[in-house]
């Protein structure tokens, strides 16, 4: 039981791990160099390591809800099932991007479909185990790689009244890749944080009451991530702090044209040593991301 509690104390990152490898010459492989295949874990946003060449990641996360979780009138538990189809592009020639993005600007592309369950432990506590398996392609090196990742996310409701709803977030995460003709790599991480949501009085959007959603999380990487930023220097990252702000509806998803979002906002990420920074779109809670 103690080990199980420790397991729940962790999980969700790697989403920022490796697209920075675009700036690394292929004949140089520093110890534990971040591989481009890890770009599949990024959310849509701008990423930078120590003012080195920036990378923009565009992640399309379509998903299909097969069944929603909850408890029926008899108290029987219903496990939610969600099928995910994330398609990720890594863009590395930012100065060359015109008004309309062309394929020549793409450094990487990956497709990693997966399944995610939502298990309601009780009325306050829910778990989300998930697994994704797919492949990616890097244009400059003409390299393919198998990609897989999975983990367990936890959300525990600490309080809910008319003024504020807040929850404890935890997660553990494990991911890996296998390039052609090269050895495989693996990464693990653990996350803990708090999530808040409060109504915005009489403010509405599209006839629906608005809520202000925000969270703060800390993610620890079990292994340092090394980024080769120039010929003489490698920067290492061991953790990530993240703050997210967003607006959402009280009872249903937000919608722009035909695309639905849980919420709309931004998140800011940085490492403790200040070498890594990122600004990402904040479209879902870390629990349902």
Regions found by a protein language model. Give the residues of each.
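Residues that define the transmembrane beta-barrel architecture of outer-membrane proteins
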Residues: 52-62, 79, 105-111, 144-150, ...
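Transmembrane beta-strands of outer-membrane beta-barrel proteins
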Residues: 77-85, 127-131, 148-150, 164-172, ...
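Residues on the lipid-exposed face of transmembrane beta-strands in outer-membrane beta-barrel proteins
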Residues: 58-68, 111-119, 133, 152-158, ...
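Short glycine/proline- and aromatic-enriched beta-strand/turn motifs that initiate or cap beta-hairpins
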Residues: 21-98, 289
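Detector for outer-membrane/organellar transmembrane beta-barrel domains
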Residues: 143-226
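Outer membrane beta-barrel transmembrane domains
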Residues: 91-103, 204-289
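Short loop/turn motifs that connect adjacent beta-strands in outer-membrane beta-barrel proteins
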Residues: 65-82, 119-127, 159-167, 200-211, ...
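Transmembrane beta-strands of outer-membrane beta-barrel pores
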Residues: 44-46, 64, 87-95, 119, ...
